[in-house]
Amino acid sequence: MKPQSINSTMDSTIERLGDKLKTIGEVRERCGVGSISFGILHHGEVIFTGSTGHRDVLEKKEPDTSTLYTLCSISKSFIAAALGILVHQGKCKWTDAVGRYIPEFKPKGDVRVATKATFNDFLRHSGGLANPVVTLLGPEGKVLVSQEDFINVLNDAPNGNERFGTYYSRTWEYSNVSHGLLALVIERISEKRYADFISEEILKPLGMNDTVVYKSRLSSDANIAHSYVRLSDGSWCKQPDHEWTNECNTPVLAMVGIRSSIKDLLIWSAATMDAQWGEESKPLAALSNIEMNPLREVNSILNKAYWTRPHKDDLQTLSNFHLSWYKCVMPSSMVHWGSWNMSLADNGNKDQNYINENILGRDSPQQPLYKITGIGFCGTASVNLFPKTMSAVVVLGSGLNTGDPSDFTAAIMIQALFDLKKQIDIIPMVSYEREMRLRDWKSLKNDWNKHRDIYSVEHPAKEYVGEYTGLGITLTVRANAVSEGLQLIFNGREEIMQNLEYYNEDMYSYQPINRDNWLRGGWLDWDHFMVGILHFKRKNGLVSGVTWVWERGCDAALFNKGNT
């Protein structure tokens, strides 16, 4: 643990923060991840930073304020900021239909997704596109689709389902791919590669010199927090390095691939608040080395267009999703919004009494909170802005295992920073979350076993061999050259070939059902037993396609077999 007080005077606020270092170490241990780094901005000044664990567990290298973590969905805040600059320059409007800038965007189904859905719509996740991210991001951190082929994913992405109907302007449907679309539009409007625009228009003017949008910056000796997770036997596993940070694949970089540090995200937080609430007569200390804040249209990003995010806590304060940022008013259960702590906020496993009992600052004055979070197999991240005091709490974690360490650490530091009442003991929440995540896995595995029937008719493997196209990619099923089984290849990526296991008649499974193997492989969420199962379909007795339930609750996507 390496705390570092920036202020020369250890006032009561900094003392409270320092008292929480041991607790944050416990969070990391119980969540089973390699490292956590954090920083606190208060009254526009960086007052506290720290870290726990190792950015490289095997070599015992500790993280610091410049250590690089993958931002995952926090990357999306740069999309909104880039569009804000372009809107300010008069090159586009928030209310423009996005499809006018990219005519090859021709989604199947609801054409309004291209002809009417605006920048506002897509940034607040009401543009109508679903989230088939598993067709983009494969196991072991591999990217499955090139930038050139990304348009095929967009055009194939569902824009409704059988139960609900169309999504556009009717519901909040979180969509990574829609943000990839916006990044491509930014390239069209600016006539620059997205990475170049972000670097030249945002990162360099703000002095965010740690932040990485170019693959070449990721050398073997770079100050990177590698993703480590603790396995069931107590050993540490280094997960695969991902391919998400690459300027040559704008959609993936913009959605989830930017890497940054605590130092730079504190600048990012200060610049965002300064652009909206700053006063020229009172420059923020955190921006003392900045000649000019390049951020524009921040009020439009943070406070105008939004989609409500209803929740069921007993306080019922404001809860809206704006343009890449979420806004609530504390006290609220939604302080934990967007995290991988599934027992909190509006996430899946809901015990409302438990949620209400653990609301931070229930007896403290109300104040607005703006936040954005990131979740990936490689780690979690949490950025929290408090404009009332020009404060920010930023947390970055490497690895994802049993709970969201960044969210818990943010809660600990928010509570200490503002001395919230009544105080909540976070550690029992961490233990409960860990128990729930392991229980969920056991339940998932039980469902997988319950629906399996290995005694059903198994047809000759050669009937399934072929290429199946859908959702913008190709699934290749081939015979195993060594055994009598089948193998699955995602969109030509031979290096992540998966052996298929017989599951039921015309059904084969590729997902690991051993949790340690799931962690080793760097898989995305496996939240339903059918997500890892291919269900082959027949026409006139011959295999004609395969359906894939790629996400809990989605309609099964059909992949058509070639030459049928």
Where are these regions (language model features)?
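Short loop/turn motifs at secondary-structure junctions and domain boundaries
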Residues: 27-33, 61, 361-364, 373-377, ...
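Short, conserved catalytic-motif segment at the N-terminal edge
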Residues: 11-71, 91-93, 106-107, 155-165
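Short, well-ordered beta-strand elements
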Residues: 380-385, 389-399, 546-547
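A short acidic/small-residue loop/turn micro-motif
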Residues: 53-57, 400-402, 551-552
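Peripheral terminal and inter-domain segments
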Residues: 316, 330-355, 359-368, 407-564
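Active-site SXXK
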Residues: 18-24, 38, 44, 70-98, ...
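Short, surface-exposed loop or secondary-structure junction motifs
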Residues: 45, 54-56, 110-376, 381
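Short, glycine/proline-biased beta-turn/loop segments that scaffold the active-site neighborhood
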Residues: 93-110, 204-206
